[in-house]
Amino acid sequence: MAFCIWMTGLPCSGKTTIVRKLTENIPNLAILDGDELREWLSPKNFSKEARDEHQFKVAHLAKLLLKHNVPMGVSTISPYKANRAKAREIIGDDTKFFEVYVNASLAQCEERDVKGMYAKARSGEIKGFTGIDDPYEAPDNADLVLDTENKSLDESAAEVLEFLKSKNLL
């Protein structure tokens, strides 16, 4: 059965790692990674307009995949509440779209950052970086909240699997 797990959270909160772990139990899960998609789908800058455009393109791609019965995990920062609401509207069907908030503190995310993106943002080398000089608006009503600050990424992936089972999607 097709579904869209829309992972949102600060950079380095664990979104992509969790989605990749899900493929161990859901082999046909498509992964729509925001960083990878940005390389060829959207503008390379991090302006509000570029982020909006990127989110809408990812949402339309997810809608197309759902139409063809492809289950997917979308791993994208999705920093703005309005954009996540728009993604839900574009994709439609609340029985198949689930917003998952991957919650970790800014300090924890900076500690996990192997690419040095936070350091570049703090030094001013990168502008508009979420959590540093651009806000992240945490969801008020996510379908599932994962606490990756206090739980391992394996435990978090297991929570997603249990959630999907509770919805009779696995």
Identify the function of each model-found stretch:
Residues 4:
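Walker A (P-loop) ATP-phosphate-binding motif of ABC ATPase nucleotide-binding domains
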Residues 7:
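Hydrophobic anchor at the beta1->P-loop junction of P-loop NTPases
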Residues 15:
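Conserved lysine of the Walker
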Residues 19-60:
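Conserved substrate/cofactor phosphate-moiety recognition/catalytic segment
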Residues 31-34, 69-77:
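Short beta-strand segments at enzyme active-site cores
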Residues 45, 62-68, 77-121, 128:
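ATP-dependent NMP and nucleoside kinases share a basic, alpha-helical "lid"
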Residues 103-106, 111-159, 167-170:
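Small-molecule kinase domains that catalyze NTP-dependent phosphoryl transfer to phosphate-bearing small molecules
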